[in-house]
Amino acid sequence: MSDKTVKSTNLMAFVATKMLERQEDLDTCTEMQVEKMKTSTKARLRTESSFAPRTWEDAIKDGELLFNGTILQTESPTMTPASVEMKGKKFPIDFAPSNIAPIGQNPIYLSPCIPNFDGNVWEATMYHHRGATLTKTMNCNCFQRTIWCHPNPSRMRLSYAFVLYCRNTKKICGYLIAKQVAGIETGIRKCFRCIKSGFVMATDEISLTILQSIKSGAQLDPYWGNEKPDIDKTEAYMLSLREAGP
């Protein structure tokens, strides 16, 4: 087995443990799913003991380190001040540090920047790759990604969102409306794959409409030039975009 298998096991050990720490927020079905994920992860850990011996606690610690660049939240969405409204529902956004570097050789990630006639607004271009529909507004290989994950106890779903920006032009370059995927373990793995593959955006028509509204109103903001995220400024900025509307 590869080192990737070990890392995946460590990640799932960390995620399962963190989710069960907020057991009171999970309904019975969701709790059973997470417990099943924990059991299967422990079984994988025993299988890997012949070539990568480690304790459950060690796996959790390493999984937490591997999780650097993303953030898993099991708090109530109402605790997050910034949100985007879609079909009358508000989807919260949270911000986390992430790496600033191209990822892999994803053809969509490596596609060129596409400015419109006046060079100020970046045209959204639809791509279809491996069954996913993605929207690319621009690409300078300098993306900063952030992800928000929230297990929804009532629907047994995992929602996630990406906010992307370009440090070269100091503009927002992409935005992914929170999307729900079925199954806790499947959803978490899908989030990991999105990050590792460098996919910029997976969207539907509603998401694209909101994206176009946000990018057309993109403006210079001190946050985008910062070396590290300024959480308060960013949340206030995204909140102002939502309140301004299309």
Swiss-Prot record:
Variant or mutagenesis effect after changing residue 96 to T: In strain: C/Ann Arbor/1/50-pi
Cellular component terms per the entry's GO annotation: host cell cytoplasm; host cell nucleus
GO molecular function, one term: RNA binding
The record's account of how the chain is modified after translation: The NS1 protein of strain C/Ann Arbor/1/50-pi is phosphorylated.
Family matches, as InterPro entries: Flu_C_NS1 (IPR005187), Flu_C_NS2 (IPR005188), NS1 (IPR004208)
Alphabetical UniProt keywords: Host cytoplasm, Host nucleus, Host-virus interaction, Inhibition of host innate immune response by virus, Inhibition of host interferon signaling pathway by virus, Inhibition of host RIG-I by virus, Inhibition of host RLR pathway by virus, Interferon antiviral system evasion, RNA-binding, Viral immunoevasion
Result of changing residue 84 to I: In strain: C/Ann Arbor/1/50-pi
Family affiliation: Belongs to the influenza C viruses NS1 family.
Protein name: Non-structural protein 1
